[in-house]
């Protein structure tokens, strides 16, 4: 089975506070995009994982490997798989590359082994592996709350293009959250009502105005180059620019492909860049 595993961006990321268990309560609008990994899964005796296109571990520290183990634990069945991941999503970017792969494995094995697990059951299993897996399983446009386990589908964003720019460095998610500790974020919170209204009307101009990610504050402290790169993108006059997740990837929102191409070709910073569109689904089976 060949599965497309879409990446995600955060159109907004608000942090409401830290829970007693150390996790942070979030309020985030996430969007799946047409950039993604290809995950090939075949039934097997044990767990055999191969990654092409990135230097990643292929043992139990890999989220895709953990997904097989989690399904075994949840079902009590000796599920095995031979998995090949062809990486397209940049690493340490805030684009949920690992979680996208984990979601694809849960989705694929549920079908391959006829486990008949409901979407709700898959979300519950996924949440125990990674905070982004519940959204990655859902895809499209969604409001994500809690620590990532509460996912509410929103009307899909059908308009617009995004130019994704990944600098030649990553940002540690753990450090990004740690840097927020003790900061007064009272005036930093996004306008939730306005971003939901802009999305509901598919008003891209307003959406661009209200893009907000609190983790940008700490990312700028960790690596001030982010500020320079963001300004470079803003100078190219998109509708808005934001860092996705804990970074380091930035995205520029545009109203059409012509403007997206203009930004893409004028952007001469070191790193990776992509033109993508909103994607209305989660993991998608391309071939049985």
Swiss-Prot record:
E.C. number: 2.7.1.148
Catalytic-site annotation from UniProt: 8, 132
GO BP terms in the entry: isopentenyl diphosphate biosynthetic process, methylerythritol 4-phosphate pathway; terpenoid biosynthetic process
Disulphide connectivity of cysteines: none
Listed Gene3D superfamilies: 3.30.230.10, GHMP kinase, C-terminal domain
Reaction(s) the record says it catalyses: 4-CDP-2-C-methyl-D-erythritol + ATP = 4-CDP-2-C-methyl-D-erythritol 2-phosphate + ADP + H(+)
Binding residues annotated for ATP, in chain numbering: 90-100
Keyword Electron transport included in the entry's annotation: no
InterPro entries: GHMP_kinase_C_dom (IPR013750), GHMP_kinase_C_sf (IPR036554), GHMP_kinase_N_dom (IPR006204), IspE (IPR004424), Ribosomal_Su5_D2-typ_SF (IPR020568), Ribsml_uS5_D2-typ_fold_subgr (IPR014721)
Assigned keywords, A-Z: ATP-binding, Isoprene biosynthesis, Kinase, Nucleotide-binding, Transferase
GO molecular function, one term: ATP binding
Pathway membership, UniProt: Isoprenoid biosynthesis; isopentenyl diphosphate biosynthesis via DXP pathway; isopentenyl diphosphate from 1-deoxy-D-xylulose 5-phosphate: step 3/6
Keyword presence, Transferase: yes
Protein task: Catalyzes the phosphorylation of the position 2 hydroxy group of 4-diphosphocytidyl-2C-methyl-D-erythritol.
HAMAP family referenced in this protein's UniProt entry, alphabetically: IspE
Family statement drawn from the similarity comment of this UniProt entry: Belongs to the GHMP kinase family. IspE subfamily.
Name listed for the protein in its UniProt record: 4-diphosphocytidyl-2-C-methyl-D-erythritol kinase
Gene behind this protein: ispE
